[in-house]
């Protein structure tokens, strides 16, 4: 009988040890799992950051996957030229080329009959001619006065390549493509011995109520704000400046009780577009009190401080900021490497794994 108890005890001890080991493994896996929440107003570059994670950490886009973006790229291109043509009338700008009026009529006719995402050689020629009209170019220069995709010039300047027979989108074409994010999109990848779960949440106002489900157990928030949006208004409310909306949103997230212990990283994105714009449009259009030099560095630092000054718990909570260009893979790779080091330092120093 004694040996029976002994073997039962051994079995019990073995099971107990196995359970302990499993609990330890689960704890280690959980400690190595990083839940990243990407937040920010609409069109701030969140989805482009997600695409970069696929390029940098998940073997990029296959030819087949790139081909799936072709219709989106053509749709973005058509929407851009239609938006500029519409703004010509609103802003009272005339065409210079005599043929452009006829091209405009044909453009509208074809846009109404073609399937979304189609691009015929005839349509491509019409778009090319219109884009070459000095009146259209003058209207494009005033893009902040109406809603236009950031990718407009990228695609319209490269129509010959985009509409050539056998065209296969490259990664830059994919990165510049725009589809409004609705709901929550999760991307998983591994980096520096950590398992990342990145959640991209729709930025337009109507999408924000869905964020609440993502709050629990978030390791780090990356907040994207478009530097170049300082002279632009919201798609969903043309009375509201995009930069002001972004600051308002950042304020509510940065000081939210849910995120008291969450690392927050600020991506001041679209620095390339900001650099172009700041040479032409003074920052005082957004911040009337700003009287400093209208340079990339001075104006950029001023915007950065507008965000950082919203942090009400500076002594307890540091907000890390980076100027980014989400379409620049090397820039995102460098910045995300730094973000990962912050996560390791802030969140894993107490678990004894590093």
UniProtKB/Swiss-Prot annotation:
Q: Where is this region: G3 motif?
A: 196-205
Q: Which keywords fit this entry according to its UniProt record?
A: Cytoplasm, GTP-binding, Lipoprotein, Magnesium, Metal-binding, Myristate, Nucleotide-binding, Transducer
Q: Which Gene3D superfamilies match?
A: GI Alpha 1, domain 2-like, P-loop containing nucleotide triphosphate hydrolases
Chain intervals for the UniProt region annotation (G1 motif): 35-48
Which residue intervals define the domain G-alpha in the entry? 32-354
Tell me yes or no: is Cytoplasm among this UniProt entry's keywords. yes
InterPro entries the record matches: Gprotein_alpha_I, Gprotein_alpha_su, GproteinA_insert, P-loop_NTPase
Which family, according to UniProt? Belongs to the G-alpha family. G(i/o/t/z) subfamily.
Listed name of the protein = Guanine nucleotide-binding protein G(t) subunit alpha-3
């Amino acid at each position: 009988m004694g040996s029976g108890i002994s073997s039962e005890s051994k079995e019990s001890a073995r099971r107990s040890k196995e359970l302990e080991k499993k609990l330890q493994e689960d704890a280690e896996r959980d400690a190595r799992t990083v839940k990243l929440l990407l937040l920010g107003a609409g069109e701030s570059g969140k989805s482009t950051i997600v695409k970069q994670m696929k390029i940098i950490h998940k073997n990029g886009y296959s030819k087949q996957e790139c081909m799936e973006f072709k219709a989106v790229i053509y749709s973005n291109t058509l929407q851009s030229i239609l938006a500029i043509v519409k703004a010509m009338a609103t802003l009272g700008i005339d065409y210079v080329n005599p043929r452009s009026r006829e091209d405009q009529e044909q453009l509208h006719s074809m846009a109404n009959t073609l399937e979304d995402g189609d691009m015929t050689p005839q349509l491509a020629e019409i778009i090319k001619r219109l884009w070459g009209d000095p009146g259209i170019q003058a209207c494009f220069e005033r893009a902040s006065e109406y809603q236009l995709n950031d990718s407009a010039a990228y695609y319209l300047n490269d129509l010959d390549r985009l509409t050539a027979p056998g065209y296969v989108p490259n990664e830059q074409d994919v990165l510049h493509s725009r589809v409004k994010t609705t709901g929550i999109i999760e991307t998983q990848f591994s980096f520096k011995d950590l398992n990342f779960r990145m959640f991209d949440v729709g930025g337009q106002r109507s999408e924000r109520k869905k964020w609440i489900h993502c709050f629990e157990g978030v390791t780090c928030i990356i907040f994207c704000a478009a530097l170049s949006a300082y002279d632009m208004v919201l798609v969903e409310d043309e009375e509201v400046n995009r930069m002001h909306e972004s600051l308002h949103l950042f304020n509510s997230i940065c000081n939210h009780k849910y995120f008291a212990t969450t690392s927050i990283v600020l991506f001041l994105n679209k620095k390339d577009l900001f650099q172009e714009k700041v040479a032409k449009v003074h920052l005082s259009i957004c911040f009337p009190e700003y009287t400093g030099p209208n340079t990339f560095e001075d104006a950029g630092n001023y915007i950065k401080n507008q965000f950082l000054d919203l942090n009400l718990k500076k002594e307890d909570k540091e907000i890390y900021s980076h100027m980014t260009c989400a379409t620049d893979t090397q820039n995102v790779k460098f910045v995300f490497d730094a973000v990962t080091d912050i996560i390791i330092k802030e969140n894993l120093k107490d678990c004894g794994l590093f």
